[in-house]
From Swiss-Prot:
Annotated region (Domain I), positions in chain: 1-63
CDD domains: UBA_RuvA_C
SUPFAM superfamilies listed in its UniProt record: DNA helicase RuvA subunit, C-terminal domain (SSF46929), Nucleic acid-binding proteins (SSF50249), RuvA domain 2-like (SSF47781)
Official protein name in the record: Holliday junction branch migration complex subunit RuvA
Family: Belongs to the RuvA family.
Entry keywords, A to Z: Cytoplasm, DNA damage, DNA recombination, DNA repair, DNA-binding
Summary of subunit composition and partner proteins: Homotetramer. Forms an RuvA(8)-RuvB(12)-Holliday junction (HJ) complex. HJ DNA is sandwiched between 2 RuvA tetramers; dsDNA enters through RuvA and exits via RuvB. An RuvB hexamer assembles on each DNA strand where it exits the tetramer. Each RuvB hexamer is contacted by two RuvA subunits (via domain III) on 2 adjacent RuvB subunits; this complex drives branch migration. In the full resolvosome a probable DNA-RuvA(4)-RuvB(12)-RuvC(2) complex forms which resolves the HJ.
Region Flexible linker: start-end pairs: 143-149
Organism annotation: Anoxybacillus flavithermus (strain DSM 21510 / WK1)
InterPro entries assigned to the protein according to its UniProt record, in alphabetical order: DNA_helicase_Holl-junc_RuvA_I (IPR013849), Hlx-hairpin-Hlx_DNA-bd_motif (IPR003583), NA-bd_OB-fold (IPR012340), RuvA (IPR000085), RuvA_2-like (IPR010994), RuvA_C (IPR011114), RuvA_C_sf (IPR036267)
Function description: The RuvA-RuvB-RuvC complex processes Holliday junction (HJ) DNA during genetic recombination and DNA repair, while the RuvA-RuvB complex plays an important role in the rescue of blocked DNA replication forks via replication fork reversal (RFR). RuvA specifically binds to HJ cruciform DNA, conferring on it an open structure. The RuvB hexamer acts as an ATP-dependent pump, pulling dsDNA into and through the RuvAB complex. HJ branch migration allows RuvC to scan DNA until it finds its consensus sequence, where it cleaves and resolves the cruciform DNA.
Segments of this protein annotated with the region Domain II: 64-142
């Protein structure tokens, strides 16, 4: 397995980049090839994933190890291949992607290219609880919320349950609530606005 390639950006097109290293040009498929355009003729490091099947041998490349790990995890989901995984990562919402999986927010996941209801549910089934080890360095605040905020949000969730809302309904709005810094009452008001839409 090739961990990374250090070289110069020789060529960029909509599907891939070519990284030149010691006279060899490596064709590397990436989520956003043009994000490498600014580094043209500069030495960079691309973290690679080697994809091997009977009729396919391809290199996929990423700016960070975390991005590469998410790509590898997405490939484990039934119904998602390399092109689909690249399209999801190309949306550039990695933190929101992980948060939506953890919160079982299939509506948000369906916003990603090529992800329908069935694939979104499969992503949650296959990946929930398996991404925390990948993302702490990249998204330090995702799994470590301030205690005061966590308590306020927890109290709001309990209040919504007491009002008769099901866990499934509540979990759909939790990612939106986590983006705010509110009191318990503030979280409840915001949640009700979202739930009553």
């Amino acid at each position: 397995m090739i961990e990374f390639i250090r070289g110069y950006v020789d060529y960029v097109c909509p599907e891939y980049v070519v990284i030149e290293n010691n006279g060899v040009g490596y064709q590397i498929f990436t989520p956003n090839p043009f994000s490498f355009q600014m580094n043209k003729q500069q030495q960079i490091v691309v973290y690679t994933y080697q994809y091997v099947r009977e009729d396919v041998l391809a290199l996929y490349g990423f700016h960070t190890r975390q991005e590469r790990m998410l790509f590898a995890k997405l490939l484990q989901v039934s119904g998602i291949g390399p092109k689909g995984a690249l399209a999801i990562l190309a949306a550039g919402q990695l933190e929101q992607l992980v948060e939506a999986i953890e919160a079982e927010n299939d509506q948000f996941l369906c916003k990603f290219p090529g992800v329908g209801k069935k694939t979104a549910r499969q992503m949650i089934l296959d990946l929930k609880g398996k991404l925390q080890a990948i993302v702490p360095d990249a998204f330090p605040n995702l799994f470590t919320e301030p205690l005061e905020e966590t308590n306020a949000l927890s109290e709001a969730i309990e209040a919504l349950k007491a009002l008769g809302y099901a866990d499934k309904e509540i979990q759909k709005v939790v990612p939106m609530l986590r983006q705010e810094r509110l009191s318990t009452e503030g979280y409840i008001k915001l949640a009700l606005q979202k739930l009553l839409k």
